[in-house]
Amino acid sequence: MSSPESSTESRLAALEARVTELEDLNAIRRLQWAYGYYIDYNRPEEVAGLFAKDGAVVFLSGEYVGYEGVMRLYGTWFQNLFTGGRRGPVHGLLLDHFQLQDVITIAPDGQTAKGRFRGILAGGWHDDILKDKPEGMPQQFWESGMYENDYVKEDDVWKIQRLDYMMQWQADYETGWSKTVAHLQPAAQCFPENPIGPDRILPDTQVRQTWPHRAEVPMSFAHPVLAHSFAVGDFTKLQKKWP
């Protein structure tokens, strides 16, 4: 029979572990939310500072690797397309990235984690700056995508290891998603041939087509009740009663 002291120590250790997990969840949530705010106002250096030393971003089926890759995407690609090379908010330009619906799973060792978030983007150019709108883009648009991200704790601070954004749909604000074909298409050429291209392109079997194409996004989390992680195409059998 265990002594009262050992029982108390066990309970305290269990409580400490639970508190640590809650703190980790909130730290990762705060990290991802901060990412959204920084890209809203075109702050690429701050965005890059959220990533681990060997961090990477997957965007439009291309992978941008390390600090140089992250800065090429957020500091060069986005600036060339949206802000004319300017840092910070631009008069008349709307690029709000909402980070929502998180499901975060901390690894047993507390050093890595996976997180699924939904992103919604409201974007567009006011009439005042319509001349700055890139050719081929709608003046006002919506976009939504899924993040399936990896996080790592470096020097006791949570950072983004791999941010994997999978676009789900785009919509011209005036005409709606039923009449929209995505103005962004999968990457076709790597850096340096394409000065704003990714460091590598995903294998053909992993390339993600954009709207109106639809595909299931792998889920990193276990079912809250059935305690099982479901792979793409892995559906629970129909049942006549609750399990």
Identify what each model region corresponds to.
Residues P44-G124:
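A solvent-exposed, acidic/Ser-Thr-rich amphipathic alpha-helical stretch
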Residues Q99-I104, M146-V152:
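Hydrophobic/aromatic beta-strand elements that line small-molecule binding cavities or substrate pockets
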Residues N26, L93-L95, Q140-W142:
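Transmembrane beta-barrel outer-membrane domains
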Residues A122-H126, Q168-W169:
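Short, solvent-exposed loop/turn segments at secondary-structure junctions
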Residues D24-D40:
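Short, aromatic-enriched amphipathic alpha-helices that serve as compact interaction elements
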Residues S2-L25, E135-P138, E154-P243:
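Terminal "cap-and-tail" regions of soluble proteins that handle hydrophobic small molecules
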Residues G88-G92, D132-Q139:
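Short, P/G- and charge-enriched loop/turn segments at secondary-structure junctions
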Residues D128-L130, T175-G176:
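Outer-membrane beta-barrel translocator domains and adjoining extracellular loop/strand segments
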